């Protein structure tokens, strides 16, 4: 199981939101690149980056920072937030981003998913953000008509190999992950499931490992010091 430290970028800074609310922001660093390098030095094998401004506006906003990250970090970076076209995917992969995450665009534009998966294969990951079991879109501002599991199965049919499953109600709350929902998702699909949202301590890492997810995205708990990255990586092995 891989631990993915999260670097969320808003207005050029490294921040954390609570439940995806843009007015509930805590700034942890003015230098997201340095933050990524810090997690790499501590043993991270992979970095999870979100352009929050991009998620909100529908197109990548923090391109210079993201490009710098891709160049300076020696570990792969997966990026989400505002990726809505094949051209954007191609540009980001050319800049050195390892994987891109399609979220809102996957719900609204299945044709894009089909084309992206056909062209870029494993370099495309589907981000499924759920609120009470329903898929949320547009920076979590709206809820779609899909249940998370139905949507995940649809993405698997289109050729997706990996999904990132986020429980919005837990995100940034340090309330513990929704283990039941994660387990249901793992059992429902035959592709890799990366868990996101609510991780608060080392026990949560152990529990998620037992559920069978292939990776865990950790944000707030790393920034508050409630979770030690090195210990988390050790437990995840």
From Swiss-Prot:
Its main location: cytoplasm. Keywords: Amino-acid biosynthesis, Cytoplasm, Histidine biosynthesis, Isomerase. It is an enzyme of class 5 (isomerase). SUPFAM superfamilies: Ribulose-phoshate binding barrel. GO terms for biological process: L-histidine biosynthetic process; L-tryptophan biosynthetic process. Pathway: Amino-acid biosynthesis; L-histidine biosynthesis; L-histidine from 5-phospho-alpha-D-ribose 1-diphosphate: step 4/9. Coiled coil: none annotated. This is 1-(5-phosphoribosyl)-5-[(5-phosphoribosylamino)methylideneamino] imidazole-4-carboxamide isomerase. It comes from Thermoanaerobacter pseudethanolicus (strain ATCC 33223 / 39E) (Clostridium thermohydrosulfuricum). The lineage of its organism: Bacteria, Bacillati, Bacillota, Clostridia, Thermoanaerobacterales.
